[in-house]
Design a protein with these regions (language model features):
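Conserved AMP-binding/adenylate-forming core of the ANL superfamily
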Residues: 33, 41-86, 90-94, 111-116, ...
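Structural core segment of the AMP-binding/adenylate-forming
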Residues: 98-189
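Conserved AMP-binding/adenylation subdomain of ANL enzymes
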Residues: 234-252, 260-301
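Conserved AMP-binding A3 loop
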Residues: 53-55, 202, 211-235
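A short N-terminal helical cap/helix-turn-helix that marks the beginning
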Residues: 2-5, 21-44, 59
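Conserved structural elements of the adenylate-forming
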Residues: 58-63, 192-197, 226-248, 256, ...
């Protein structure tokens, strides 16, 4: 496409920002995999004192993708991710993309009625949530015919031993125990399924293919599902970096906006992870923790 100053007079004010970009046409996972091959030892994300490299992150995604195939997930299936910003959320999101599924992103503080609506509206056959939100899914599961599997993760599974002890003595002790015979798959058990899966699991998707369902605010009525493509997010990532010429791979983003939010997923997570940035995952915002993380990680964004 030839861009002329007559048709686009604003290009004279762009400075070093290019007038056009050559957009990556693959999937969101492939964008992350591509940057991981370039910077394997760079840190992809930090979470409560633990850091994970791009190399390890891609390995986690692939293991999760194999686990999804092991429980019967097929291309085009919808998987609800009802989680705060934590490692399991990011891993599952890209694993769903890798197997050709569509991630249905839901606010974990949604009411039971809202969760039932999101599950039915999307036709989700699988859901991932935290142990502390298990009761919501248990309450609505019998009303959602499509839902075959509920995977339960726990914040404590991603913590170092000293921090885990503190967590279990404070926040962790408030979480209601899940019955031993509950029809769920624990995150660790789920990953073990992936390690035993030996068949094909990767599905190539193009930019135009659907990848994510986000939900509108519902200010003018019932909330609406918004279907977004791989290209929507890959293009956003490239645009964000192109308009920030001072960005360098390894720069840090304090990812406090949640992944069920368009800005949180598109800018805080995918723009960083598709361009070699480092995400400091924040599961819950408080002014005190936010200030501490800013000082500790010296975040650029």
């Amino acid at each position: 496409m030839i861009i002329t100053e007559t048709r686009t007079p604003w290009i004279n004010n762009l400075g070093d920002v290019p007038a056009t970009l050559d957009y990556f046409r693959g999937s969101m996972y492939e964008a992350v995999e591509k940057i991981a091959q370039k910077y394997p030892e760079y840190i992809a994300y930090d979470f409560m004192g633990r850091s994970t490299t791009y190399k390890k992150f891609v390995e986690q995604i692939n293991l999760c993708a194999r686990a999804l195939k092991a429980i019967g997930i097929r291309e085009g299936d919808k998987i609800t991710i009802c989680m705060p910003n934590c490692p399991q959320t990011v891993i599952m999101f890209y694993a769903v993309n890798l197997v050709g599924g569509i991630a249905n992103m839901v606010h974990p503080l949604s009411s039971e009625k809202e969760i039932e609506f999101y599950l039915k509206e999307s036709g989700s056959i699988c859901a991932l949530t935290l142990d502390q939100f298990y009761h919501k899914f248990e309450a609505v599961r019998q009303h959602v015919d499509s839902l075959n599997n509920v995977i339960i993760a726990s914040i404590k599974d991603e913590l170092s031993k000293p921090i885990k002890v503190g967590y279990m003595l404070t926040e962790g002790r408030k979480i209601q125990k899940i019955p031993a015979d509950a029809p769920i798959i624990r995150w660790k058990e789920f990953f073990n399924m992936g390690s035993r899966y030996r068949w094909k699991y990767k599905v190539h998707k193009e930019g135009k293919d659907p990848a994510v369902i986000l939900y509108s605010g519902g200010t003018t009525g019932i909330t609406k599902g918004i279907l977004l493509s791989n290209l929507n997010f890959n293009a956003l990532g490239q645009q964000i970096i192109a308009t920030n010429p001072m960005f360098r791979p390894g720069d840090r983003m304090l990812a406090v906006m949640p992944m069920f939010h368009g800005f949180g997923l598109g800018v805080s997570i995918h723009s960083m992870l598709s361009q070699g940035g480092r995400c400091v995952l924040v599961p819950r915002f408080t002014p005190q923790s936010y200030a501490k993380l800013l000082l500790k990680h010296r975040c650029n964004f």
